[in-house]
Curated annotation (Swiss-Prot):
Other comment: PIGY is derived from the same bicistronic transcript that encodes these 2 different proteins.
Gene Ontology CC terms, in alphabetical order: mitochondrion
Transit peptide extent on chain: 1-40
Keyword set, alphabetical order: Mitochondrion, Transit peptide
Gene Ontology annotations of biological process type: protein stabilization
Gene it is expressed from: pyurf
Protein name from the UniProt record: Protein preY, mitochondrial
Record family assignment: Belongs to the PREY family.
Role of this protein: In mitochondria, S-adenosylmethionine-dependent methyltransferase chaperone that supports both coenzyme Q biosynthesis and NADH:ubiquinone oxidoreductase complex (complex I, MT-ND1) assembly.
Superkingdom of origin organism: Eukaryota
Chief localisation class: mitochondrion
Length: 122
């Protein structure tokens, strides 16, 4: 037991020396810890495990499109996160959004705007 205490003190001393060398002013770098929302914590005991596979819409306040950095909206009927500005939809698999741009699908067809110069008169 004494060996464990001695090792603990030695380890703490080594860590403190390393921190002092890394931050000579004594100020440690600020680290911000933000808890992430976990739907399992908020689940009532009578809910089935099947519900854990659904997307939690409260996560939308933390998620943005990786391409445009704009907010997304959740489309429950298709189980996708939609970026209306770019016209793409990110799939949600087992309650986890797949935010890889290569896996997103286009939801708007390429529309060519009609200008008055190209209209034909009959």
């Amino acid at each position: 037991m004494l060996a464990v205490r001695a090792w603990g003190r030695t380890y703490n001393t080594l860590v403190q020396r390393k921190l002092n060398a890394a931050c000579p002013t004594g100020a440690l770098p600020a680290v911000t810890l933000r808890p992430l929302h976990c739907s399992l914590v908020a689940r009532s005991p009578e809910q089935s495990l099947k519900d854990s596979k659904t997307f939690d819409p409260t996560l939308l306040q933390f998620l943005v499109c990786p391409l445009s950095r704009k907010s997304l909206r959740y489309e429950e009927s298709t189980n996708e996160l939609i970026n209306d500005e770019l016209g793409i939809a990110y799939p949600i698999v087992d309650g986890i959004p797949n935010m890889i741009p290569q896996d997103a699908r286009m939801i708007h067809k390429d529309r060519k705007p009609e200008s008055p110069d190209t209209e034909q008169t009959t």
